[in-house]
Amino acid sequence: MPLEGGNGIAARDSPLSRKLLRDRASNQMHRRQTHSPRPSVTEPRRALLLAVRSFVRAAQVCPGVLRIALMGSLVTSKAIPKDADVLVTIDNMMDLTELASAGRRLKGSAQTINLGADIFLADTTGRYLGRICHYRECHPRMACLAQHCGRREHLNDDLHVVTLSKELLARPPIDLWPNVVRRLTVPPDVETLLLTELERPA
């Protein structure tokens, strides 16, 4: 299957180019390292992929959501991913309430198997905004690492903790919505459980 770029032009498909894309999917997400994942189920990838699919279905109808993409360890063949990493491009003026609710459901599904999920946000200019906050209501907390807590509801702008490169924002490994776009060789479970289902007519 040809690999598609964000502009619809076929990219070179070679073992080296696929390896570089996989490396970029992790290297361009700069975050502090924590403990190794210890999921409570034998097939954590399946559980996370199903949770991501549900998130996409919910997020795609949120006014202001323009693109949903998948990145991180789920786009690799890593048997035990640490979490589900989703990138959502938004209209910078959108109300984040509905998207945050969908994000908390994704996080909750991941937490039930002792894993995590992050919903990263970018605007239409390719600027990284931060992550969806996992708290339902915004008020001062010692655990909150947002640089401007409360300035925008449901946005955790902890850019000193996590940053995404402009290249990753522009060309994430897999676009999930509004169109499925593969920029690397997709693991079989991602293809079967996620992409094939998302490509089915509504």
Residues covered by each model-derived region:
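Aromatic/basic-lined ligand-recognition segments
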Residues: 87
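Catalytic core of pol beta-like nucleotidyltransferases
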Residues: 14-67, 75-81, 90-202
